[in-house]
């Protein structure tokens, strides 16, 4: 055991291997070798350099978005009368940023005032006062219970509450949507971006977009792909959804602005690409999008409000992209990596030559040469030998 360990250590410290070039005249191996090199060459040039632009350094962007909407809608509702709805009425928030809601439908509870009234059946049905704990508010309650059980209508009793009365009843959503004209509303998107690494600034109002063009253009992915004015109906349809059904219960639509810029060309070629996505599926557990807001006023010294349950389309504007420009460092790194990948051809062909082909033993003899130290060198004495020689023994094993 000790002798074997000594031999292993001796071999580790006192042996050295060096590559030996062997020219193999084998058509099969030669063709495979060149094919692998060709595949590597196509990968390095076609994918790494041309498609992935491995010769460029890249930079992310910083972005700012603002929006403006235009359009009018008219409603005729009991308790509210005829009303014209403009952008100040149906856009939330009113200043418009990268995320906003356009109201398309609503349920109004008019003339609410603080007082006592019967709760909505969803907030608590009762048989007598024992079922109404004073001061308690259920999950769907619209006020604080007083402890009394009172008639809600001719057939149902509910707990009396103190809160805004009369309570909201929202089980019937108007169909079609009250603000169905929203399909023709227009949205103007103003987007400014910067690539800080390259000190390049761009806007979506590119060179082709001027004042005259903007007054008459409306975005179309083929006819007017650079127009920053969008029809809400077109945006929703391009997201894969139906505007009328979305307008009734609300939903969410994503608008992406993608900037992929090659700054090796003139900066005017850096242009935005718009895409639209439906972000809520129809089979969502909680379909639609809604929220509530109130209009407060004073009538005969009493604080009152009109309560609106708003159904609307929420638009989220997302900006993404990057810019690339030639740089010698990534270029040299990519070239070096590509040259290294060429070594794959040698490894695979050696595997085929030395372990798979029928004449593998013969090729091993030609590939590897074993050199041994046969004795002391010139000027050295070997007490165990009558003479000093230096020789090389080549072990040739035939297949």
UniProtKB/Swiss-Prot annotation:
Entry binding sites for ATP: 70, 186, 286, 290, 292, 309
Gene3D superfamilies according to UniProt: atp-gated p2x4 ion channel, atp-gated p2x4 ion channel domain
Function: ATP-gated nonselective transmembrane cation channel permeable to potassium, sodium and with relatively high calcium permeability. Furthermore, CTP functions as a weak affinity agonist for P2RX1. Plays a role in male fertility, bladder contraction and platelet aggregation. Specifically, plays an important role in neurogenic contraction of smooth muscle of the vas deferens, and therefore is essential for normal male reproductive function. In addition, contributes to smooth muscle contractions of the urinary bladder.
Modified residues (Phosphothreonine): 389
Family: Belongs to the P2X receptor family.
A GO molecular-function descriptor: ATP binding
Protein name stated in the entry: P2X purinoceptor 1
Domain notes: The N-terminal 20 to 23 and 27 to 29 residues seem to play a role in the cholesterol-dependent gating of this receptor.
Location(s), subcellular: Cell membrane
Tissues where the protein occurs: Expressed in smooth muscle of the bladder and arteries.
Transmembrane segments: 29-50, 339-358
Regulation of this protein's activity per its record: Activated by low concentrations of ATP (<1 uM). Undergoes rapid desensitisation. Sensitives to the ATP agonist:alpha/beta-methylene-ATP. Modulated by cholesterol.
Keyword Phosphoprotein recorded: yes
Source organism (scientific name): Mus musculus
GO biological process terms, semicolon-separated: apoptotic process; ceramide biosynthetic process; establishment of localization in cell; insemination; monoatomic ion transport; neuronal action potential; platelet activation; positive regulation of calcium ion import across plasma membrane
Glycosylated residue positions: 153, 184, 210, 300
Extracellular side: 51-338
Catalytic activity: Ca(2+)(in) = Ca(2+)(out); K(+)(in) = K(+)(out); Na(+)(in) = Na(+)(out)
Disulphide bonds in the chain: 117-165, 126-149, 132-159, 217-227, 261-270
Membrane topology classification: Multi-pass membrane protein
């Amino acid at each position: 055991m000790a002798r074997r360990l000594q031999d292993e250590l001796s071999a580790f410290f006192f042996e050295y291997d060096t590559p030996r070039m062997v020219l193999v005249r084998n058509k099969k191996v030669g063709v495979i070798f060149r094919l692998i090199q060709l595949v590597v060459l196509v990968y390095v040039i076609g994918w790494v350099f041309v498609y992935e632009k491995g010769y460029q350094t890249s930079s992310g962007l910083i972005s700012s978005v603002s929006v403006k909407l235009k359009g009018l809608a008219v409603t005729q509702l009991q308790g509210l009368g005829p009303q014209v709805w403009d952008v100040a009425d149906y856009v939330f928030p009113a200043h418009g940023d990268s995320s906003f809601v356009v109201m398309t439908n609503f349920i109004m509870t008019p003339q609410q005032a603080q007082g006592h009234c019967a709760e909505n059946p969803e907030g608590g049905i009762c048989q007598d006062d024992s079922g109404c704990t004073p001061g308690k508010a259920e999950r769907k309650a619209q006020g604080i219970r007083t402890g009394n059980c009172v008639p809600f209508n001719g057939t149902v009793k509910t707990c009396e509450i103190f809160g805004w009365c009369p309570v909201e009843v929202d089980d019937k959503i108007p169909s079609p949507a009250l603000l169905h004209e929203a399909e023709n509303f227009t949205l103007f998107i103003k987007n400014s971006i910067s690539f800080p690494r390259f000190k390049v600034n761009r806007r979506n109002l590119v060179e082709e977009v001027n004042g005259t063009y903007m007054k008459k253009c409306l975005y179309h992915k083929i006819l007017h792909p650079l127009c920053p004015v969008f029809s809400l109906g077109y945006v929703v349809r391009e997201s894969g959804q139906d505007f009328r059904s979305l307008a009734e219960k609300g939903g969410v639509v994503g608008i992406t602005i993608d900037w992929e810029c090659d700054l090796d060309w003139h900066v005017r070629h850096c242009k935005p690409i718009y895409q639209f996505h439906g972000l809520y599926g129809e089979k969502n557990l909680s379909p639609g999008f809604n929220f509530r807001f109130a209009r407060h006023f004073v009538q005969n010294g009493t604080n009152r409000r009109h309560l609106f349950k708003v159904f609307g389309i929420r638009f989220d504007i997302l900006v993404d992209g990057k810019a690339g420009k030639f740089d010698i460092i990534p270029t040299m790194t990519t070239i070096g990596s590509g040259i290294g990948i060429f070594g794959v051809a040698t490894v695979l062909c050696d595997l085929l030559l030395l372990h798979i082909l029928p004449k593998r033993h013969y090729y091993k003899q030609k590939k590897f040469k074993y050199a041994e130290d046969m004795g002391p060198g010139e000027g050295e004495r070997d007490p165990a030998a009558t003479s000093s020689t230096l020789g090389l023994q080549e072990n040739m094993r035939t297949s």
